[in-house]
Design a protein with these regions (language model features):
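Alpha/propeptide regions of enzymes that mature by internal proteolysis
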Residues: 1-181
Length: 181
């Protein structure tokens, strides 16, 4: 029996990076799958902030993503995905586009939440370094939940939000994992 976390699914790794204090209260969470994995998403809401989610359409040419980046910082936080791409490029992981192992384009869909100014300074928000560090921190095993990573500045209806994860094995034997902010 597993931990009841998304990392119960073989090959899935999760990493967080966040900053608190001195005007900061935001972060980034990365779900990394070495070798890539099929993925999908459902974008809702009146002001969604996303990047590369069109690639998750089943009719798209790309059939694998290398990581998913979830971040605070509203639209500014989408910059964290660049750091995730940089980490993958340095590890020669991505969609091959040339003859050299380093000639790759990592496929990293991203989504953000609005947490601007939660720490007191509006301009303190995730950047590419947040994504790089969260990706480098990705591990299997127990996932830290609550006010970490992308959930650091999460608030809903005045209540503190955060990162949560779960997994379940269906009667068919298929293992399903989920992570949400």
């Amino acid at each position: 029996m597993g931990l009841g976390h998304i990392t119960d699914v073989p090959g899935i790794l999760v990493g967080h990076y966040q900053r608190r204090g001195k005007g900061w209260r935001t972060g980034t969470t990365v779900v990394r799958v070495d070798g890539g994995a099929m993925s999908s998403c459902d974008v809702r809401g009146g002001g969604p902030g996303t990047r590369e989610t069109d690639l998750l359409d089943p009719t798209a040419m790309i059939d694998r993503v290398h990581a998913i980046c979830l971040s605070g910082g509203s639209a500014y936080g989408l910059a964290a995905a660049h750091g995730v791409m940089r980490w993958h490029e340095e590890h020669h992981a991505g969609f091959p586009v040339g003859p050299q192992p380093s000639h790759v384009v990592p496929i990293v869909p991203a989504a953000v939440i609005f947490d601007l100014g939660r720490g007191g300074v509006f301009t303190n928000r995730p950047n590419d370094e947040f994504g790089f560090r969260a990706c480098a921190a990705a591990r299997s095993g127990a996932v830290t939940m609550g006010s970490v990573g992308a959930g650091t500045g999460a608030v809903a209806g005045g209540l503190q939000g955060g990162v949560g994860t779960a997994s379940i094995t269906l009667e068919s034997g298929i293992l399903v994992g989920a992570l949400a902010v």
